[in-house]
Amino acid sequence: MFPMVTEFMNYGQQTIRAARYIGQGFMITLSHANRLPVTIQYPYEKLITSERFRGRIHFEFDKCIACEVCVRVCPIDLPVVDWKLETDIRKKRLLNYSIDFGICIFCGNCVEYCPTNCLSMTEEYELSTYDRHELNYNQIALGRLPMSIIDDYTIRTILNLPEIKT
């Protein structure tokens, strides 16, 4: 055949192929139109975190036996445990316990391996401050229970996000 005719046929095939690709992309865009939005208006709406969410660590001073298992299993040796050996009863007495959340990677190893369950993960994730030294929590700050977002009337909580079907 003539070269001009074959070029015209190739041009027609390429045009049809391009139109098909544009149509496929448009169909994907239309399939997302009936889904609910994934984003939330953060300060005014908050998601209720799952049970397994790893937020700020809660510490119960009375349960701790100063065994330092949390320090040994921490990948960055983060918890600082100060204790004193009581010679009359031959047991350790905990003096101070602190965690710096500016360095913590929230892996949860300390909570998982604690033999007395004095450590637990809370759902509190708002730990931002203007000074990084304020993120060093001692046993008093670690012992405070987190404020539940369910009890705050100014915040609308979003319970269940629908599953995205693909």
Swiss-Prot record:
Record lineage: Eukaryota, Viridiplantae, Streptophyta, Embryophyta, Tracheophyta
A molecular function GO annotation: NADH dehydrogenase (ubiquinone) activity
Family matches, as InterPro entries: 4Fe4S_Fe-S-bd, 4Fe4S_Fe_S_CS, NADH_quinone_OxRdtase_chainI, NDHI
UniProt-annotated location(s): Plastid, Chloroplast thylakoid membrane
Protein known as: NAD(P)H-quinone oxidoreductase subunit I, chloroplastic
Keywords: 4Fe-4S, Chloroplast, Iron, Iron-sulfur, Membrane, Metal-binding, NAD, NADP, Plastid, Plastoquinone, Quinone, Repeat, Thylakoid, Translocase
Complex formation: NDH is composed of at least 16 different subunits, 5 of which are encoded in the nucleus.
Family membership noted in the UniProt record: Belongs to the complex I 23 kDa subunit family.
GO biological process: photosynthesis, light reaction
Chain residues that bind [4Fe-4S] cluster 1: C64, C67, C70, C114
Binding annotation for [4Fe-4S] cluster 2: C74, C104, C107, C110
Cofactor comment text: Binds 2 [4Fe-4S] clusters per subunit.
A single Gene Ontology CC term: chloroplast thylakoid membrane
Membrane topology: Peripheral membrane protein
Xref: PANTHER family: NAD(P)H-QUINONE OXIDOREDUCTASE SUBUNIT I, CHLOROPLASTIC
Enzyme class: translocase
Catalytic activity, EC: 7.1.1.-
Reaction(s) this enzyme catalyzes, per UniProt: a plastoquinone + NADH + (n+1) H(+)(in) = a plastoquinol + NAD(+) + n H(+)(out); a plastoquinone + NADPH + (n+1) H(+)(in) = a plastoquinol + NADP(+) + n H(+)(out)
Function: NDH shuttles electrons from NAD(P)H:plastoquinone, via FMN and iron-sulfur (Fe-S) centers, to quinones in the photosynthetic chain and possibly in a chloroplast respiratory chain. The immediate electron acceptor for the enzyme in this species is believed to be plastoquinone. Couples the redox reaction to proton translocation, and thus conserves the redox energy in a proton gradient.
Start and end residues of each 4Fe-4S ferredoxin-type domain: 55-84, 95-124
Cofactor(s) this protein requires: [4Fe-4S] cluster
